[in-house]
């Protein structure tokens, strides 16, 4: 981090937790003085549109109006990823001010994105929590679940199954475990789909497609309110927002369901 001078120039990333400051739905751009950033701490984390991209250290009090990162999923993917990166870096810096080994204060390293203990020298890098997310298909049907956190009296969002990868577990094992734990369904033909940084606050969603193998839906009631098979040609419940990897998985799987039905 450096103390910003009045003429420091570029795009500016300001965060408050998972919220960001935007001007007309875009990152503020210009010199530090014009955006009231002079004297604040910031670090350059790359470039955006051929100009320096600065991440400003979070302030305890800030009268600017911030918008939730969740409300920005419709932005172009590269822009959403830039915003997610800023949120995750500031989360890391805010939660690693002290050494996890000896408890003394840390400081940022100069040559890489990390913090180092000023007492014992222990170095810590940004923590990324890997999570799997999977769409399961059975012929021309897709398995969708209404998680308890998504439930509402009107039904709420139905989405794909997801969960954190456990210690010592492969992504493939995590997918099979999560699907079976939450729905009692066994799967096969597992294949990688894609990934998405998920800065709430520091996950990496790794997406898969899978086919049904066996079993009847048996809910993990502590996690899942409802789960059903939905045919591609029937009315669907409320789905995750456009821009999420969950929505992309659902779209691709519904296309596979449609193709399967045409081949019957």
Swiss-Prot record:
Keyword GTP-binding: no
Residues bound to a divalent metal cation 1: 162, 182, 223
Molecular-function GO terms, alphabetical: magnesium ion binding; manganese ion binding; NAD+ diphosphatase activity; NADH pyrophosphatase activity; RNA NAD-cap (NMN-forming) hydrolase activity; zinc ion binding
Entries under SUPFAM superfamilies matching the protein: Nudix
GO cellular component: cytosol
Cofactor(s), names only, from the UniProt record: Mg(2+); Mn(2+); Zn(2+)
Nudix hydrolase domain mapped to chain residues: 126-253
EC number: 3.6.1.-, 3.6.1.22
InterPro entries: NAD-cap_RNA_hydrolase_NudC (IPR050241), NudC-like_C (IPR049734), NUDIX_hydrolase-like_dom_sf (IPR015797), NUDIX_hydrolase_CS (IPR020084), NUDIX_hydrolase_dom (IPR000086), RNA_Hydrolase_NudC (IPR022925), Znr_NADH_PPase (IPR015376)
Record flagged with keyword Glycoprotein: no
Known catalytic reactions: a 5'-end NAD(+)-phospho-ribonucleoside in mRNA + H2O = a 5'-end phospho-adenosine-phospho-ribonucleoside in mRNA + beta-nicotinamide D-ribonucleotide + 2 H(+); NAD(+) + H2O = beta-nicotinamide D-ribonucleotide + AMP + 2 H(+); NADH + H2O = reduced beta-nicotinamide D-ribonucleotide + AMP + 2 H(+)
Keywords: Hydrolase, Magnesium, Manganese, Metal-binding, NAD, Zinc
Entry binding sites for a divalent metal cation 3: 178, 182, 223
PROSITE patterns for the chain: NUDIX, NUDIX_BOX
Residues that coordinate or bind Zn(2+): 99, 102, 117, 120
Motif placement: Nudix box: 163-184
Residues bound to substrate: 70, 112, 125, 196-203, 246
Subunit structure: Homodimer.
Summary of the function given for this chain in its UniProt record: mRNA decapping enzyme that specifically removes the nicotinamide adenine dinucleotide (NAD) cap from a subset of mRNAs by hydrolyzing the diphosphate linkage to produce nicotinamide mononucleotide (NMN) and 5' monophosphate mRNA. The NAD-cap is present at the 5'-end of some mRNAs and stabilizes RNA against 5'-processing. Has preference for mRNAs with a 5'-end purine. Catalyzes the hydrolysis of a broad range of dinucleotide pyrophosphates.
Family: Belongs to the Nudix hydrolase family. NudC subfamily.
HAMAP family given in the database record: Nudix_NudC
Record's protein name: NAD-capped RNA hydrolase NudC
Organism expressing this protein natively: Haemophilus influenzae (strain PittEE)
Biological classification of the source: Bacteria, Pseudomonadati, Pseudomonadota, Gammaproteobacteria, Pasteurellales
Gene name for this UniProt entry: nudC
């Amino acid at each position: 981090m450096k103390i910003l001078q009045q003429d420091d120039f570029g795009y500016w990333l300001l965060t408050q937790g998972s919220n960001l400051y935007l001007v007309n739905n875009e990152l503020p751009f210009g010199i530090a003085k014009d955006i009231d950033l002079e004297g604040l701490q910031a670090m350059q984390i790359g470039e955006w549109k051929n100009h320096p991209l600065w991440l400003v250290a979070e302030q305890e009090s800030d009268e600017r109006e911030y918008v939730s990162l969740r409300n920005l999923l419709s932005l172009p993917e590269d822009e959403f990823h830039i915003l997610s990166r800023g949120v995750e870096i500031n989360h890391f810096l805010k939660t690693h001010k002290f050494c996890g080994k000896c408890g003394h204060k840390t400081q940022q390293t100069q040559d890489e994105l990390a913090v180092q203990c000023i007492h014992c020298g222990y170095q810590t890098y940004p923590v990324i929590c890997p999570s799997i997310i999977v769409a399961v298909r059975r012929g021309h049907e897709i398995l969708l679940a209404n998680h308890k956190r998504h439930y509402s009296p009107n039904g709420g969002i139905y989405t794909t199954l997801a969960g954190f990868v456990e210690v010592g577990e492969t992504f493939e094992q995590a997918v099979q475990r999560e699907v079976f734990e939450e729905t009692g369904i066994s799967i096969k033909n597992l294949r990688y789909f894609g990934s998405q940084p998920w800065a709430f606050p520091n996950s990496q969603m790794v997406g898969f497609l899978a086919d049904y193998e066996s079993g009847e839906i048996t809910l993990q009631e502590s996690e899942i309110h409802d789960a059903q098979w939905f045919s591609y040609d029937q009315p669907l419940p409320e789905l995750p927002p456009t821009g999420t990897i969950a929505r992309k998985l659902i779209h691709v799987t519904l296309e596979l369901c449609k193709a399967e039905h045409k081949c019957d």
